[in-house]
Amino acid sequence: MERHPVILSIAGSDCSGGAGIQADIKTISALGGYAASVITAVTVQNTLGVHAVQSVLPEIVRGQIEAVMDDLRPVAIKIGMVSDIQIVRTIVDCLRKYIPEYIVYDPVMVLSLIHISEPTRRS
């Protein structure tokens, strides 16, 4: 039986499905890979904009990475939205520990989400 290559996506979650982990899973699957995921942040967004961003605790991010790396052993890691410097440090620590064969860095930082809607910024 042929094993599909495991690709790990480390990124934010987009509830509308148009970006982040959801888009990565669709793309990896369409290309014949097996998608594993690590959520770095949860966003409230749609086609009209980003309304809120909540980072995941760094220890949860570390736990997710370790769970996937220890079991599934991905051949590649794709890194997208990283919303917090502590999460960046956590990811770097894990990359040093596991030394994946391929890393794709597709940076989406919170600063690029500066157009968070006015009502959300006031609350």
What are these regions (language model features)?
Residues V75-V88:
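N-terminal glycine-rich "phosphate-gripper" loop used for MgATP/nucleotide binding
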Residues G63, A67, Q86-D93, K97:
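Alpha-helical scaffolding segments of alpha/beta enzyme cores, especially the outer helices
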Residues Y98-I103:
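A short helix->loop->beta-strand "cap" motif at the edges of active sites that frequently abuts
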Residues V82, V108-V110:
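Active-site beta-loop-alpha junctions enriched in small/polar residues
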Residues H115-S123:
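Single conserved hydrophobic/aromatic residue that forms the stacking wall/gate
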Residues A76, V104-Y105:
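Generic enzyme active-site microenvironment
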Residues M1-A76:
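Small-residue (G/A/S/T)-rich helix-start motifs and N-terminal tracts that mark the onset
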Residues Q86, L111-I114:
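Short, well-ordered, mixed-charge alpha-helical segments that flank or form enzyme active sites
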